[in-house]
Regions:
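Core alpha/beta nucleotide-donor-binding catalytic domains of modification enzymes
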Residues: 1-167
Length: 167
């Protein structure tokens, strides 16, 4: 079992590495309800509270699985228990054409960017499996050396920053 103090210390170090000492007033965490994003929610809520940073929570319900609404409701309840405002954004635009995972990812980023307002940073959690999957998908697509990587710790998306403290 991972030591919670070490986990919190490691998270704080990752955040400092990404943000430096100029901390934002407002941040958000994108939470799907999966283990990676729920862990991120708890860590980010604690980290932000200790630094007087206003934290909000956003969930994108892609409505592709029957249980997705229940997962969004669970995230809302946990967020409220932590004293954090929560918003669920629904994606209804899948037309059945093309690459579903890519369309869902793009929709998630677009919806979050449309929602975020003055929030400068949105944290997103990813597991090691997500990292490996991203690397393998890029390899399969024939990415060159520059394109062969996992998910970058910081993404600049539409003039906003989307951060992944799991690096």
């Amino acid at each position: 079992m991972t030591d919670p103090v070490c986990l919190k210390t490691g998270f704080a170090a990752a955040m400092t590495s990404m943000l430096g000492t100029d901390l934002p007033q407002k941040m958000a965490v994108a939470v799907s309800g999966g283990g990676d994003s729920m862990a991120l929610l708890y860590l980010a809520a604690d980290w932000a509270r200790l630094r007087a940073i206003e934290m909000a929570v956003v969930t994108v319900d892609h409505q592709l699985r029957r249980e997705s609404g229940e997962e969004a409701a669970l995230v809302k309840q946990v967020s409220q228990d932590l004293g954090l405002p929560h918003t669920t954004l629904a994606w209804r635009d899948w037309n059945g054409q093309g690459n579903l995972p890519d369309a869902a990812r793009r929709a998630r980023l677009d919806l979050i960017n449309g929602w975020r307002g003055p929030v400068q940073y949105v944290l997103m959690g990813h597991t090691q499996d997500d990292q490996a999957e991203t690397f393998l998908m890029r390899l399969r697509r024939g990415s060159g050396v520059d394109g062969l990587s996992g998910i970058a710790p910081v993404h600049d998306v539409m003039a906003s920053k989307i951060d992944d403290p799991s690096g």
